[in-house]
Design a protein with these regions (language model features):
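Cleft-lining beta-strand/loop regions that shape enzyme active-site pockets
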Residues: 20-31, 35-52, 75, 107-111, ...
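Structural motif
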Residues: 125-127
């Protein structure tokens, strides 16, 4: 009887699974047929000419946005952007540009070292007046950037107003494959402490980090600070490669698991480490996501590093690239990943998110405890919680306004033009600061201090309650003080 019961139960599972599969297939077939019928009917009957590309793209985006923020459709024309995301390379001249005003010229902000821009004499502050015969007036910074990019080996012609000589010259630049390194800085903080800032996880960043580590080791490094703040992640394979540098061969780094067959994977280190003894601090914040969290979580779970900063973003999802017809691609979430202790850093749901998308407060009752290699308690449910919490510096709203308005950058470029022959070791004097203040006052930018925002809100509430007349003198004095503070 027991055998018969087991057979009956097994058959029930098989039948129900098959029925579910058929139900899902029917739903997909029905949905596809309805969608195609709607498009055909619109094309035949709609009162105006049908913007097919626009409505199809809107439909695709709406469908994918209902799943998660990371599953996206990539049309053929955006493949170059995908390559930039994967390997941080593109075909171009190798320079950061800046456009202070839409009707002005685009300005070279920084030519990369060894880039075609630098080789052909483009300097910081040079104004690009024309690109291939087209004026940059009226073009956005992005439109100018797009015109500078192209297939390596092709050329682009610029009409340039040189910042130093004030001469207008024609320059023809041959585009090259530009690679932007993820290791943006590596140096010594003191005689024994090395510091490495890593901004991404594109191809071969583990090799870049290895080289930077060996260079600092040669300079006497005895302790390492690895800064992953603001690092939004990238390739999982590079995260595994970085952990491999600091833990014994064969150590578990991360595992992934999804619903589809073949998505459960376990990733261990496969090479001999560089150094398993050097003390490491990993710096993180709410901008540290994905592969950054894999590295941080693994080094924390293996008790190989001390994590400092603020809680990480909380993106524990794995994306894969799938080819689509007409050279399009689908970046689709296929699995969740888990640290060596078994934690998933993905936020429990999207309701526990801050405005910037990072994980918000989650009560311990909704999370689970896990143990590190040495028995320390860590928790899941959203991001990696640092061993030592250190809040970042909170800049004033005025500072943010000046930075994001471009006023500081614009003044710096003007300063370069006026002081083209300045020594490399120059220092800003008080008169330079006064010049910046005067320059900023000539620019219109949106700035309201937090205090002014709260004051206006309080004043409205007092007016509603009929109390503002009794406090008019105090309110006027406070408003005057706030205006003086803004000045």
């Amino acid at each position: 009887m027991k055998i018969k019961s087991l057979i009956a139960a097994s058959l029930a599972v098989v039948v129900s699974t098959a029925a579910f599969g058929q139900s899902q297939s029917f739903k997909f077939g029905k949905w596809t047929e309805i969608q195609n019928s709607i498009l055909k009917e619109l094309n035949r009957s709609y009162v105006d000419s049908l913007p097919v590309d626009r409505i199809e793209r809107a439909g695709i985006n709406a469908m994918l946005e209902s799943l998660d923020p990371y599953t996206v459709y990539i049309p053929e024309e955006e493949n170059e952007d995908l390559m930039m995301m994967i390997n941080k390379s593109y075909g171009g001249i190798g320079a950061l540009i800046y456009k202070p005003e839409k009707d002005g010229n685009v300005i070279i902000n920084e030519p990369y070292k060894g880039s075609p821009a630098e080789k052909h004499g483009l300097s910081c502050g040079d104004e690009i007046m024309e690109i291939d015969g087209q004026s940059t007036h009226g073009l956005t910074s992005q439109e100018c950037s797009d015109r500078m990019k192209g297939k390596p080996g092709t050329t682009v012609k610029f009409k340039v107003l040189k910042v130093r000589s004030k001469e207008v010259v024609d320059i023809i630049v041959t585009r090259e494959r530009i690679h932007l390194p993820d290791i943006e800085y590596a140096g010594m903080l003191n005689d024994t402490t090395g510091y490495i800032y890593q901004s991404g996880f594109t191809e071969n960043v583990s090799g870049e980090l290895r080289n930077a580590f060996l260079k600092l080791k040669g300079q006497g490094m005895k302790k390492l600070v690895l800064d992953l703040r603001g690092n939004g992640g990238g390739l999982m394979s590079e995260a595994v490669g970085i952990v491999s540098l600091f833990v014994p061969k064969g150590s578990m780094v991360v595992s992934s698991k999804g619903q589809a067959a073949g998505t459960e994977m376990h990733y261990k280190t496969t090479s001999e480490p560089l150094d398993t003894e050097i003390p490491i601090i990993v710096m993180v914040d709410s901008g540290s996501a994905s592969s950054s969290e894999i590295v941080t979580g693994a080094l924390q779970d293996l008790d190989r590093a001390t994590v400092m900063g603020t809680r990480t973003f909380g993106k524990g999802l794995v994306q894969s690239i799938r080819p689509l017809p007409y050279n399009g691609q689908l970046k689709v979430t296929t699995a969740k990943y888990y640290t060596p202790s078994g934690r998933c850093v993905q936020a429990i749901d999207y309701s526990h998110r801050n405005e910037d998308g990072s994980v918000g407060y989650i009560p311990d009752s909704l999370t689970h405890e896990f143990k590190t290699a040495h028995g320390r308690t860590v928790r899941d449910g959203g991001g990696i919680t640092p061993d030592v919490t250190i809040e970042g510096h909170d800049y004033s709203r005025l500072t943010y306004s000046l930075v994001y308005s471009g006023i500081i950058q614009e003044y710096a470029l003007d300063y370069v033009r006026e002081h083209a022959d300045a020594d490399e070791d120059f220092h800003l004097a008080d008169k330079d600061w006064d010049g910046f203040v005067a320059f900023a006052k000539t620019k219109e930018f949106d700035y309201r201090s937090s205090a002014k925002t709260y004051f206006d809100r309080m004043k409205k509430e007092l007016e509603k309650d009929g109390l503002s007349k009794n406090m008019s003198a105090e309110l006027d004095a406070l408003q005057k003080a706030l205006e003086m503070d803004k000045e």
